Amino acid sequence: GHLDHVGAVKPIQDALRVPFAIGGGDRPLLALLPEHGLAFGMRGLKTPTIDLDLAEVSAIPFGSGVIRVVKTPGHTPGGCTFLFGDRGEKGLFGDSLFHLSVGRTDLGGDADVYARTIRDVILPMPDATEVHAGHGPSSTMAVEKRDNPFLNGQLDIGCPDLPM
């Protein structure tokens, strides 16, 4: 629910009458959108209406298939990753995973939750899964497992007693 991902949702929602989905854990962040906008010099940001709480679903119909909704909290409480393809070959990770990095936790996130998400949810994903992040270049899980210091144990995300 950070500004850089949801700041333009309300005017789009109003103009196009499209639904908005977000992980329910991000409701408090979303409620602060107008204030966060002011902190970055953006006046008049409005909080969008949530039409679908992603915490309540595991899949969303899409064309002739489905998008798998995988809960990946840590960067934000309601963080989700979206997997496409029969075996989740393509992933939209938002800020849960970047090429050679991960999202920050100091704006409503939780480093310990994030470390568990990495260990229990992200690391088990197949090596062939394409990683499309909210910022920066794309990658694959194989590259991230090998080279990302937050995934391969070189850097600690904030929970030193949690074995990765």
Language-model regions: role of each:
Residues 1-65, 146-154:
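Active-site HxH/HxHxD metal-binding segment of metal-dependent hydrolases
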Residues 32-40, 59, 66-71, 76-164:
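Metallo-beta-lactamase
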